[in-house]
Amino acid sequence: YGSTMRAVLEKVRPNSMSQMNAVQLYRPSVAQRQKEMLNLSLQKLEEASLSAQSSTKEEASLRMQEAQLISRFVAKARTVVPKGEVILNESNIDSVLLEDGDVINIPEKTSLVMVHGEVLFPNAVSWQKGMTTEDYIEKCGGLTQKSGNARIIVIRQNGAAVNAEDVDSLKPGDEIMVLPKYESK
C-alpha cells in the first residue's frame, strides 16, 4: 500500500509464460465507482423509457411494451458486478500508486486470438503474423446477418479496448468483439 506499480513489478520473478507487458490491475474503489455510474445510467435509461410521449393509442401501447422490456433489462443489468479494472500504460507505470485491496494479475502468454459477438461461429483462432481483423472474422464463418454495419472492437490483453479500424496489427492474446447493430424505432 503506497508503493508504485513499478516497484512491485520489479520484485516479481516472471516465468517464461508471463506476459509482463499486459499486466492487469483490479481496484475495489474503481469497481465501486463503476457500479455507481452504471446505476446512474440505468436510472436515466429507465426514466427516459417511462417518460416518452405518445401521440396515438397504438404508439402508447408500443411504448409501454418497450418500457417493460427496458425495465427487465435494467433489473438484470443492476446485478452486474464491475471488475474495477484499471488499464495501465507502460509509459507511466512509475506513477501508478497502489491502494489497499488492489489485485495485480500477470496473464499468461497465449498464441490465440479470441473472436466473439456477431460472428457465425465464435471461436479461438491461432495467431498468425500479418492476419487482419477481417481474416480472423472470416475464420469464424464471417459476420452474422444481424451484424449489419456492426462496430468491431479489439480488446488487448491488458484490457484496453480499441476500435478495430485503428489497429495496425493484432497480437497474440487480443480479442475481437463484433458488436451488434442496434435498430432504433
Language-model segment annotations:
Residues Y1-K185:
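Ser/Thr/Pro/Gly-biased, low-complexity, turn-/loop-rich segments
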